[in-house]
């Protein structure tokens, strides 16, 4: 029976198929070519068959008579067309049923034989197609249907004729059963009349109609608006076929009226067999079906006979060879699809067949998956033919993959497959996820409503890394924990994420189709409020349901947020400005037409209206008469028709929209769907082709601005050309005549391939290749090129801005032409234009996200242009950032849009270096929103902006500072807030992704920090910043950090992205505190004073540049540190600061104290180095946090005096006994600096010096530090000493207090004194002795602080060596915290001795030449005694605490001891018992073991200790500062500290215990020095062991190393080292309460003996004195040179370096001295290494140049290039490195060399730095003020790069 049935069915089907084959192929929705040819004629002639009652037949329980009608009989249609359209199998699972075969009217005609409706047999329910839920539900980004008519054809229709489509069941039984039929059994012939192609027929069942209805009202229409009846409800109401027919006819009639371009749902269009251009799906073509060229995935042969049951099936005979096209797994479908050679070899039959009927050929096809019951063709049974083996493994693998592929559902269930969230159509996403509103919106809105009532919410941007992390979490369909403390510290990241989500929607929340409706509604006269409200309600109701629900929720949320405008400053108007570009976008605007300018203001007005009246608009909708009027009942056809007419107008796109869409299709169309093609639409064709095509087709159309419908009707050819292709990233204008050609040869891809041949590598590197693409800025490929590229990019962007503006004045066609040509032009200008142009933007990236980006770039470029200081650059940069190609090339599907945009930005940015480009990309988007918003969306981005801007700033020296530097950091501020924010958010994400992509690269890591550093929050202060730009620029890095700090007035934690991770929660959380803003302001003020010095501009440049380069590098060298770096804590100084900021812990709200604290604590480590530099600078400059330099600069002016007062108080506290006061004391000098110009300068210098150590890690900081050290240090340190003394006076006698505080203050004062003592004493001779002594103390303390920071950073850079030292130092610090008071006293005594000694020394080298010579002599001479004293003191402390570590001290004598000394001295404030020997031993013995523990404890401590640190009781810190100075610069201290003892003898006398211990310590140091001389190499190498500690304490280690290396640098480096040491002490003291990042922890970990501290202090004072004499001249020359000119400084430094070469020889003679210096150098070299690393990628060239100059001069430029610290460190490291080189201090030298030689990875930089340490010249360079050198180098680098 079954045979009979199958035979009869087969005969009928084949006969029918034969006819259809003759008429033409049969096509279906799936487009599978179907050509069934009857095998025999008799089958076709077979009489009607009567099915015997088989189970399937029983379901029908009737005889079915089938009648085959020849194709000729069809009057209007070719048989193939009609039948192809009726391919049921493609739409419904019922397709397999025999009812699909043409019904034949038999003896028993059905009651309604002509009825168009057919009942489908129930016998077969299996579907050969995956279920709908298995199919991807997607939405087109652009749809251009035009008028669409869908009609139901009845039997009378001429189109139907007697076609098989009018099939009906025959027979009485079937008829009667059918009369009581269910609508589901009905089939309909539907005629689709699209505008752009001939009408065609499709066959659909009632079930299909229900599906259509469901999809329409789930994705497109609200039923109340559509007026369509619910088909499911109708099913129960339709008793007869006629009722069903009538209902369906009316339904389709209504649908035809409302159908418009809003039908973006791919499922609906596929149902209609239409593509998004209104054309029939290509596969419906009979010709295409017959000539199918789909590649086969396997070969099979028939093992069972199968006769086609439907037109889209093929017959299989046993033995037939079949090429399998699609082989779904049995779980998905039993149906395979393949093609079979016909009897005529030239023809193929293509169709479906059961997989059980064939057996695959080849043993490589895995058949282990379950097969259907009849496994006749199982692999085991199928013979293996070698015929396909020749295809090789690739084919076999592909086939096996296809065969074994899991189903979508299974992939989803397993979590492997996830639907996109970002950059996914809203309706598509909600349908796929089953949510009413996006989870992103719900989660973020709830979080912001709970925690986000803060200033600038939605205006400021969050940290890019956090945004990216959140984005990835949502894309992975998991809701991140927004309630964790880390996120609460960066609330702006959540708000940025939310804006980014809406910005990247392919179809905006307020859809393209309704854009004009919104505009019309809002343009109603104000006096017609009711009318406006009514129109707005109607327009909102027209939104697709998902959009409506989402908009309602969002508007209500924004309304709630606006109610807190008193606290947030975000009124409904401000929110509208920020949100408008994310919610409303016009195709015309995105296409870059003149309308781009037109809609910006309107968007904000519409958004504001929606926010203000959300309750009226949305809540009243249900009761609104308009809404009910929209609802049409099936019974009220007239009402429906009338409503439909009205709705038709509203629902269909207006002509302007159509025109815009057409234009987009022509110009942007290509760009619109880059998601299909990663290639940008604009790049698909050559520039000439694009221009020609635009002029030929689009030009006229665009000029005419005709609606698409008009266009199509008017010129069918043009229209067809325009919309004849599926949108795949390019419109017809860009697409070649052949669609496949477009796919095969996208221009953008072609360009990319050559540029990015190693594309996979480029993804992970910051190389400019990413930016290579079109941008003519390929210059950025090199680091130096990147600088130049940035400059050129900025220029290009300016040009582009002008072009963009010009574009708006030109006809759209011309504009599009220009845009296209520009986009395709590989010129920077063109690149910018392209990126700006919507085409290029969309084309470059996924059309969805990129189109938004491009929209913002293009749209906001003009808009933002006025808002931004450099709008054109913003535009071009943004545009570049949003290149779609670039994003798509990103390959990062999770964050496609983010990655894509950043990559696009890179391509566009290529002018900048890869890192520069990347930074630019971030910076620009960030800058745009951040400047306008006064907050860079993400600190990371801003740093890049700052970096970019710094490059610009370098290019335009002073202006860049205020304009470029400020602009870059505040570039976001400049740009329109809302749009910029959007861009910025996207860029943030993109950049974050890029960072993740390139995180391996040194640049990338620093970039992260840069972004943090760049967090300028308040654009309003930006004007002040612009004025203060010298400060901000001198705080180049601080600009970045300041940006972030400013921007994150509360979550400043961003700055230390990675290093902060541990601290981040606290830091950011603390930072959130409002204190941070005031503190930031103060900090800014401090940097401003610094810049106010002559060095303002110079400092500005170097810092800015360093920010760019250094920050980037920072990330790599100290990923851990960045997380921990307390950039935010610095900013958060008011609140509990990060582990780094002990000062922050002090109740002081002075940001400067915070800066000092964080800098001192070194928590900021590398990532916070920029911040720390800025902190130090800012602290000294009366701004505690560099990060807030810009904003705080503006605010600092206001808060400057307060900051000074605070700083004074903090200094008093520090001077008193506060470990925290150490850091606060630095801030106090900064405040004083703010008060006094000289003081400001000195503070700025001190800050620069302080940050210089930090800067050693960060090239950016370094250059900034260098400049301050050059100018600010000389002045600043003097004044700082004075100020410190003043503060000390307040708390106690200036000297006495200062001596006590000096332990904290001395490091920076010593550094300042060292670098400034010569200058300062010479320049300010009247205070020369006293002031110098004061400075020496203050400088020593500040230097110690700064040095501590720098050492920490350097240690991070040189974490290997540093690790040991830091561990020991941390231990010392831990133990030394309580001994800090004793140590402070001892250090004070030592300082007194040093003071005297330094006074003498200072008097000796009053002349610069003398100073250079003296410096060398001093280094050789004094290091002996002074260093011995220091060493003795340190040794005592260390020995007491770390006797077992003595060996290590010997090994690390030069490296670890200096670091240890610094740490000890820092620690002395904490624990006077800290022993250098123990410290050294610890470092030597178990660097890794100790370091990690200390690192964690330190970090934890830093986090916890800020509160304690805030307690002034840590007054002993001053002694630790001195100890730090001595330890960090053991040689330096031995030189300077002895000088200090001489100069500051009075103060040191106060610390009698210190002085008493000093001799012992000195002797011990002397003995140790000797051992250290030989152990120096070991120390240098042991730090290499430190890597174990590097993870947690990499920064700390590096800092320690830097401190050592810096110590030899008696001048600036010594000061820096001392400052670093002091910071370490402060850190240690802070570590007791708040272990500073890495270094501080190390310091706290090690308890320095007071004696050792005293010895260290003495040594350091002597060293400082000597360095003051020698280094002051050197540092003065260097500082002056740096301040005056980077190149001059380099020259002088080279001279110095020569003298140092002599000194090196002398040092070799004096091994002890050299060893001492080596110890110091160890820290310095580490600093150098760290600095080099910091400069590594972003500023490698700069750093190298600096290094060379510095080494040429006096300081080792390697270290110098590494950071500001390296400048100072170079001074101390000079001798130390010389010694180290003698003893193999290679670990330090390599970094120096690296920086010198060329931009390298930070590791290389470290190596070079070490290598240079080995080199005598390099060591001497380290001895010289590394800050100045590094800053100079960074400045040069920046300038060269910019130029």
From Swiss-Prot:
Modified residues (Phosphothreonine): 843, 1118, 1121, 1679
Domain Rho-GAP stretches: 424-618
Disordered: region residues: 94-117, 746-780, 894-975, 1013-1106, 1721-1745, 1779-1829
Keywords, ordered alphabetically: Coiled coil, Developmental protein, GTPase activation, Phosphoprotein, SH3 domain
Tissues where the protein occurs: Ubiquitously expressed.
Biased composition (Polar residues): 759-771, 928-939, 1071-1097, 1779-1790, 1807-1818
Biased composition (Low complexity): 1029-1053
An example molecular function term from Gene Ontology annotations: GTPase activator activity
Composition bias type Basic and acidic residues, residue spans: 1058-1069, 1793-1806
Coiled coil spans: 1378-1404
Domain SH3: 295-363
BP term (GO), one: retinal ganglion cell axon guidance
Phosphoserine sites (modified residues): 166, 168, 180, 837, 840, 851, 861, 872, 876, 1029, 1125, 1216, 1281, 1284, 1453, 1456
Residues flagged as site, Arginine finger: 459
Cited function: Probably functions as a GTPase-activating protein (GAP) for RAC1 and/or CDC42. Required for optic stalk formation.
Protein name: GTPase-activating protein CdGAPr
Upper classification of the organism: Eukaryota, Metazoa, Ecdysozoa, Arthropoda, Hexapoda
Originating gene: CdGAPr
């Amino acid at each position: 029976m079954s045979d009979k049935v199958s035979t009869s069915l087969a005969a009928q089907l084949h006969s029918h198929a034969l006819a259809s084959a003759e008429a033409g192929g049969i096509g279906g929705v799936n487009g599978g070519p179907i050509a069934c040819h009857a095998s025999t004629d008799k089958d076709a002639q077979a009489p009607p068959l009567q099915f015997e009652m088989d189970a399937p037949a029983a379901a029908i329980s009737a005889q079915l008579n089938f009648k085959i009608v020849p194709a000729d009989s069809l009057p209007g249609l070719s048989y193939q067309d009609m039948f192809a359209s009726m391919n049921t199998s493609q739409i419904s699972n019922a397709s397999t049923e025999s009812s699909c075969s043409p019904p034949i009217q038999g003896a028993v005609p059905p009651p309604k034989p002509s009825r168009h409706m057919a009942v489908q047999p129930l016998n077969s329910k299996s579907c050969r197609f995956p279920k709908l839920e298995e199919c991807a539900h997607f939405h087109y980004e652009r749809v251009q249907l035009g008028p669409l008519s869908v009609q139901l054809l009845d039997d009378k229709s001429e189109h139907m004729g007697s076609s098989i489509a009018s099939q009906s069941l025959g027979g009485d039984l079937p008829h009667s059963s059918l009369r009581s039929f269910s609508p589901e059994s009905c089939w309909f012939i539907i005629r689709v009349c699209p505008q752009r192609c001939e009408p065609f027929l499709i066959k659909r069942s009632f079930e299909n109609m229900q599906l259509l209805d469901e999809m329409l009202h789930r994705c497109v229409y609200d039923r109340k608006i559509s007026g369509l009846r619910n088909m499911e409800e109708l099913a129960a109401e339709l008793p007869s076929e006629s009722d069903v027919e009538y209902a369906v006819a009316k339904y389709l009639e209504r649908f035809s009226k409302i159908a418009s371009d809003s039908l973006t749902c791919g499922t609906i269009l596929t149902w209609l067999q239409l593509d998004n251009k209104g054309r029939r799906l290509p596969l419906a073509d009979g010709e295409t079906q017959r000539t199918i060229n789909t590649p086969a995935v396997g070969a099979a042969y028939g093992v069972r006979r199968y006769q086609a049951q439907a037109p889209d099936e093929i017959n299989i005979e046993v033995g037939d060879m079949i090429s399998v096209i699609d082989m779904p797994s049995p779980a998905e479908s039993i149906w395979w699809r393949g093609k079979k050679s016909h009897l005529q070899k030239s023809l193929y039959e293509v169709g479906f067949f059961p997989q059980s009927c064939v057996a695959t050929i080849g043993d490589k096809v895995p058949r282990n998956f379950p097969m259907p019951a009849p496994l006749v063709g199982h692999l085991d049974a199928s013979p293996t033919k070698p015929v396909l083996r020749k295809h090789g493994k690739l084919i076999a693998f592909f086939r096996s993959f296809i065969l074994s592929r899991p189903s979508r559902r299974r992939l989803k269930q397993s979590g492997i497959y996830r639907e996109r969230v970002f950059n996914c159509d809203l309706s598509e996403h909600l349908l796929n996820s089953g949510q009413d509103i996006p989870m992103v919106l719900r989660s973020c809105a709830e979080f912001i409503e709970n925690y986000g009532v803060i200033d600038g919410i939605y205006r400021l941007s969050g940290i890019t890394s956090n945004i990216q992390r959140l984005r990835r979490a949502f894309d992975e369909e998991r809701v991140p924990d927004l309630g964790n403390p880390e996120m609460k510290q960066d609330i702006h990241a959540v708000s940025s994420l939310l804006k980014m989500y809406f910005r990247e929607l392919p179809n905006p929340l307020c859809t393209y189709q309704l854009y004009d409706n919104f505009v019309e509604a809002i343009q109603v006269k104000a006096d017609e409020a009711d009318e406006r409200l009514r129109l707005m309600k109607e327009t909102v109701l027209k939104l697709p349901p998902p959009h409506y629900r989402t908009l309602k929720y969002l508007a209500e949320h924004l309304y709630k947020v606006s109610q807190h405008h008193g606290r947030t400053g975000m009124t409904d108007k401000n929110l509208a400005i920020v949100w408008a570009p994310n919610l409303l976008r016009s195709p015309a605007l995105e296409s870059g037409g003149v309308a781009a300018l037109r809609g910006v203001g309107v968007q904000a007005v519409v958004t504001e209206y929606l926010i203000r009246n959300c309750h009226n608009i949305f809540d009243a909708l249900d009761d609104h008469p308009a809404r009910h009027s929209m609802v049409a009942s099936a019974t009220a056809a007239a009402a429906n028709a009338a409503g439909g007419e009205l709705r038709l107008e509203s629902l269909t796109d207006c002509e302007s929209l159509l025109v815009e869409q057409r234009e987009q299709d022509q110009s942007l169309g290509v760009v619109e769907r880059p998601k299909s093609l990663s290639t940008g639409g604009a790049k698909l064709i050559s520039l000439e082709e694009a221009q020609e095509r635009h002029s030929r087709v689009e030009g006229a159309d665009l000029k005419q601005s005709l609606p698409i419908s008009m266009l199509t009707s008017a010129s069918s050819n043009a229209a067809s050309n325009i919309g004849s292709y599926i949108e795949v990233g390019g419109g017809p204008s860009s697409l070649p005549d052949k669609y496949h050609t477009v796919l095969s040869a996208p221009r953008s891809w072609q360009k990319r391939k050559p540029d990015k041949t190693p594309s996979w590598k480029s993804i992970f590197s910051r190389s400019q290749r990413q930016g290579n693409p079109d941008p003519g800025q390929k210059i950025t490929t090199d680091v130096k090129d990147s600088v130049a590229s940035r400059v050129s990019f900025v220029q290009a962007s300016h040009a582009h801005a002008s072009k963009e503006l010009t574009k708006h004045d030109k006809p759209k066609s011309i504009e599009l032409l220009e845009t296209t040509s520009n986009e395709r032009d590989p010129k920077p200008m063109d690149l910018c234009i392209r990126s700006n142009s919507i085409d290029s933007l969309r084309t470059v990236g996924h059309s969805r996200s990129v189109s938004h980006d491009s929209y913002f770039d293009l749209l906001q470029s003009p808009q933002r242009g006025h808002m931004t200081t450099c709008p054109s650059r913003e535009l071009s940069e943004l545009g570049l950032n949003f290149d779609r190609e670039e994003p798509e090339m990103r390959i990062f599907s999770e964050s496609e849009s983010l990655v894509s945009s950043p990559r696009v930005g890179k391509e566009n940015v290529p002018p900048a270096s890869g890192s520069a480009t990347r930074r630019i990309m971030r910076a620009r988007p960030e800058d745009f929103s951040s400047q306008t918003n006064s907050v860079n969306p993400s600190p990371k981005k801003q740093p890049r902006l700052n970096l970019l801007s710094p490059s610009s700033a370098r290019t335009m020296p002073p202006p860049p500072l205020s304009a470029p530097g400020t602009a870059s950091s505040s570039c976001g501020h400049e740009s329109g807030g809302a749009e910029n924010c959007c861009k910025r958010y996207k860029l943030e994400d993109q950049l974050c992704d890029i960072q993740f992509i390139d995180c391996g690269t040194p640049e990338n890591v620093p970039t992260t920090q840069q972004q943090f550093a760049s967090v300028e929050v308040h654009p309003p202060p930006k004007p002040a910043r612009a004025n203060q730009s010298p400060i901000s620029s001198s705080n180049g890095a601080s600009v970045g950090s300041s940006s972030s700090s400013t921007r994150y007035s509360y979550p400043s934690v961003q700055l230390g992205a990675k290093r902060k991770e541990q601290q981040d929660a606290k830091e950011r959380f603390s930072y959130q505190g409002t204190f941070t803003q005031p503190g930031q302001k103060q900090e800014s003020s401090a940097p401003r004073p610094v810049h106010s010095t002559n060095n303002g501009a110079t400092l500005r440049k170097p810092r800015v540049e360093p920010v760019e380069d250094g920050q980037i590098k920072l990330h790599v060298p100290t990923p851990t540190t960045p997380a921990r770096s307390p950039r935010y804590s610095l900013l958060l100084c008011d609140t509990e600061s990060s582990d780094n900021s002990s000062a922050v812990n002090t109740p002081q709200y002075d940001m400067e104290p915070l800066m000092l604290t964080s800098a001192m604590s070194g928590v900021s480590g590398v990532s916070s180095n920029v911040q720390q530099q800025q902190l130090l600078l800012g602290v000294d400059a009366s701004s505690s946090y560099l990060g807030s330099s810009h904003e705080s600069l503006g605010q600092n002016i206001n808060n400057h005096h307060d900051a000074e007062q605070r700083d004074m108080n903090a200094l008093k506290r520090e001077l008193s006994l506060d470990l925290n006061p150490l850091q606060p004391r630095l801030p106090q000098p900064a405040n004083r600096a703010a008060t006094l110009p000289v003081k400001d300068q000195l503070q700025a210098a001190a800050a620069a010096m302080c940050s210089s150590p930090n800067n050693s890690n960060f090239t950016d900081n370094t250059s900034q530090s260098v400049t301050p050290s050059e100018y600010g240090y000389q002045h600043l340190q003097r004044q700082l000493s004075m100020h410190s003394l003043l503060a000390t006076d307040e708390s106690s006698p200036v000297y006495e207090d200062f001596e006590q505080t000096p332990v904290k203050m001395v490091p920076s004062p010593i550094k300042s004194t060292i670098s400034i003592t010569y200058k300062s004493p010479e320049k300010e001779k009247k205070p020369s002795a006293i002031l110098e002594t004061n400075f020496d103390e203050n400088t020593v303390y500040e230097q110690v602080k700064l040095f501590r920071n720098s050492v920490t950073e350097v240690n991070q850079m040189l974490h290997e060596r540093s690790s040991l030292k830091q561990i020991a130092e941390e231990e010392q610090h831990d133990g030394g915290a309580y001994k800090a008071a004793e140590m402070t006293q001892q250090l004070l005594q030592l300082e007194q001795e040093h003071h005297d000694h330094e006074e003498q020394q200072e008097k000796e080298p009053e002349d610069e030449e003398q100073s250079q010579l003296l410096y060398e002599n001093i280094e050789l001479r004094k290091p002996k005694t002074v260093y011995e004293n220091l060493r003795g003191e340190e040794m005592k402390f260390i020995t007491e605490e770390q006797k077992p570590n003595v060996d290590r001290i010997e090994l690390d004598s030069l490296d670890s001891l200096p670091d240890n000394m610094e740490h000890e001295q820092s620690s002395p404030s904490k624990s006077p018992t800290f022993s250098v020997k123990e410290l050294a031993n610890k470092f030597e013995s178990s660097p890794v073991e100790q370091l990690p523990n200390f690192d964690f404890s330190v970090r934890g401590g830093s986090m916890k200790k800020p509160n304690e640190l805030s307690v002034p009781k840590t007054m002993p810190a001053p002694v630790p500062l001195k100890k730090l100075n001595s330890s960090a610069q053991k040689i330096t201290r031995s030189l300077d500290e002895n000088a200090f003892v001489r100069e500051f003898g009075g103060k040191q006398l106060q610390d009698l215990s210190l002085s008493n211990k000093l001799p012992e310590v000195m002797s011990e140091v002397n003995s140790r020095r000797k051992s250290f001389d030989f152990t120096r190499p070991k120390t240098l190498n042991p730090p290499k062991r430190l890597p174990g500690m590097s993870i947690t304490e990499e920064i700390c280690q590096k800092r320690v190393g830097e401190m050592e290396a810096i110590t030899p640098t008696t001048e600036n480096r010594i000061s820096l080292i001392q400052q670093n040491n002091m910071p370490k002490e402060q850190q240690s003291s802070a570590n007791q309460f708040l272990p500073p990042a890495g270094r501080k922890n190390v310091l706290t970990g090690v308890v320095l003996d007071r004696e050792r501290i005293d010895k260290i202090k003495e040594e350091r004072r002597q060293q400082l004195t000597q360095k003051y004499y020698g280094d002051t001249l050197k540092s003065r020359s260097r500082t002056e040179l740096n301040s005056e000119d980077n190149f001059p400084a380099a020259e002088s430094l080279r001279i110095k370096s020569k003298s140092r070469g002599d000194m090196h020889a002398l040092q070799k003679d004096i091994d002890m001295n050299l060893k001492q210096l080596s110890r110091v150098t160890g820290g310095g070299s580490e600093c150098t290494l760290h600095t080099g690393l910091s400069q590594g990628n972003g500023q490698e060239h700069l750093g190298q140049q600096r290094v060379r100059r510095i080494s040429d001069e006096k300081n080792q430029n390697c270290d110098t290039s590494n950071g500001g610290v390296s400048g100072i460190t170079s001074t101390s490291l000079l001798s130390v490195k010389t010694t180290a080189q003698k003893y193999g201090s290679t670990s330090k030298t390599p970094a120096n060399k690296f920086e010198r030689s060329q931009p390298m990875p930070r590791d290389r930089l470290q190596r070079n730095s070490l290598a240079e340490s080995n080199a005598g010249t390099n060591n001497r360079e380290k001895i010289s003020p590394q800050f100045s050198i590094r800053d100079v180098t960074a400045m040069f680098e920046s300038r060269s790069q910019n130029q």
